[in-house]
A protein has these predicted regions:
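Alpha/beta catalytic cores of nucleotide-metabolism and tRNA/nucleoside-modifying enzymes
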Residues: 1-53, 57, 63, 210-225, ...
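Glycine-rich, positively charged N-terminal anion/phosphate-binding segment
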Residues: 37-47, 62-145
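N-terminal small/glycine-rich loop or linker at the start of catalytic domains
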Residues: 46-58, 101-122, 157-167, 185-202
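Active-site mouth loops of central-metabolism enzymes
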Residues: 56-66, 122-135, 171-172, 198-210
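Hydrophobic faces of well-ordered beta-strands that scaffold small-molecule active sites
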Residues: 57-61, 93-95, 123-127, 151, ...
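Active-site beta-loop-alpha junctions enriched in small/polar residues
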Residues: 62-64, 98-100, 128-130, 156-158, ...
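A structural motif
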Residues: 79, 90, 147-148, 223, ...
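Alpha/beta enzyme core
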Residues: 84, 136-167, 171-256
Length: 432
């Protein structure tokens, strides 16, 4: 069955395509597979504070990836109107990481990164901070100036430039600091009915796990949900996510949703995670790189439908081209947009027939016209290659030593010296 994915949302005066099981899947599904006479939702809508998200699916914040352009593309595939919750969204799409210092200083690039499309609801922003006072000030800006409807806090980043300052996945080790930051942002969010969530990892390494204690602390401070990437900082993106940690967190945290993250490469992976852990929803990161239609699959799967997207190469090329156009609108700079799209090209073309010479040329593309010329050389009829186009994508790497501030692991509380260091260690730039 071949359709088109060039217009993920049907026009207002048109009727959406209807799959053979009666599921409205819009015009975004391309070639789709699977049908059945009945649909039974796997999970109820996801409730995050006042927001009701139709499908329990969240786009993970990814530095340098989840800008307004990419969120728009994912939203077109995930939100075709079917199953949207009370907040008008079928999935939740979170911004890339925004550092609180850069926001408080109103850094020009940061202020651009927190902008949303008018139709983007709820407006979701992830904040990174290592200082409660700066975190509070940043949250106050977002709430008092009506710039966000949901705030997520980053306690999961494993990169050295973050952990060496005591931030990201290193921070929950300091119990008092973690609670102070979470509590400050929750308090500011409450002033505007803006719910706050946290995203974290299992811990620093296997000997320094923090997720259960941190999850309970966040729950006590009043967060609206807790998300767990089921790897340690030392694992980074290597190895296999330990979904049993998600199950244990779900058993411990009982008053707010628990979301699972890690190794969701397909809708079937998401369903399996829910079945094995009992989590209330899933957070999808690397699995959607070059596959924004994964959100169509996920929405269908959680609605009880077996419809899946299997686009031909021409449809994939059109999605890539549209992504580049959205980046051009976002940056207001075609050359910069083309430099950005380069990193996505291998993900889009994964498993498809495209020679090394063409791939090399695409990796150097510097204009939309050049991109069009190169994409025109692809065989648009080449079918979806199945397993070769699916599975793991994005960075993986190997386990590594976690770089931490001196003496960080000696005590669970901040020393006066560490408190002074942390207060001056806020990152001054947002994103990737």
């Amino acid at each position: 069955m071949t359709a088109t994915i060039t217009s993920p949302r049907p026009a207002p005066d048109s009727s959406p395509d209807v799959a053979s099981d009666g599921a409205s899947v819009g015009a975004s599904v391309g070639a789709s597979v699977g049908a059945g006479p009945e649909r039974r939702a796997v999970l109820p809508p996801l409730r995050i504070g006042r927001h009701v998200i139709g499908s329990p699916v969240v786009l993970a914040p990814m530095a340098g990836i989840t800008n307004r352009a990419f969120r728009r593309l994912c939203r077109e595939y995930g939100d075709d109107g079917a199953g949207a919750g009370a907040s008008g969204a079928n999935c939740l799409y979170v911004s890339e990481m925004i550092t609180t210092r850069a926001l408080v200083e109103r850094n020009q690039e940061t202020m651009r990164l927190i902008e949303h499309d008018p139709e983007e609801q709820p407006r979701s922003i992830q904040l990174y901070s290592v200082d409660p006072a700066t975190a509070r000030a940043a949250a106050r800006i977002l709430v008092s100036e009506d710039r966000a409807d949901h705030i997520d806090l980053n306690f999961g980043c494993p990169v050295p430039k973050v952990t060496r300052r005591g931030g990201g996945s290193a921070l929950p080790w300091k119990r008092d600091l973690f609670r102070a930051i979470v509590g400050a942002v929750v308090e500011e969010g409450a002033r505007g009915d803006v719910p706050v969530t946290v995203k974290m990892r299992v811990g620093i390494d296997a000997d320094h796990e923090t997720y259960l204690e941190a999850g309970l602390a966040a729950e006590a401070e009043g967060v609206a949900a807790v998300a767990l990437h089921a790897r340690t900082a030392a694992q980074a993106y290597s190895g296999t996510a330990d979904w049993s940690a998600i199950r244990r967190l779900k058993e411990a945290v009982t008053s707010v949703p628990v979301l699972g993250n890690g190794d969701i490469w397909s809708a079937e992976d998401a369903l399996r995670m829910v079945a094995e852990t009992g989590c209330d929803g899933v957070v999808v990161g690397r699995g959607c790189l070059g596959r924004p239609w994964l959100f169509t699959d996920l929405s269908a799967a959680f609605a009880g439908s077996s419809v899946r997207v299997t686009p031909a190469l021409g449809e994939v090329a059109e999605a890539l081209r549209r992504h580049a156009a959205y980046l051009t609108d976002f940056y207001e700079d075609e050359n910069r947009a083309c430099r950005d799209i380069r990193k996505h090209i291998a993900w889009y073309l994964k498993g498809f027939p495209a020679g090394s010479e063409l791939r090399s040329s695409l990796a150097l593309v510097d204009s939309l016209a050049a991109l069009d010329r190169l994409l025109a050389t692809l065989d648009p009829a080449a079918p979806w290659p199945g397993d070769a186009a699916e599975g793991q994508r994005g960075r993986a790497g190997s386990p590594r030593h976690v770089v931490l501030p001196e003496g960080w692991l000696r005590t669970r509380e901040l020393t006066p010296e560490q408190a002074a260091m942390v207060a001056g260690a806020e990152l001054s730039a947002s994103g990737g």
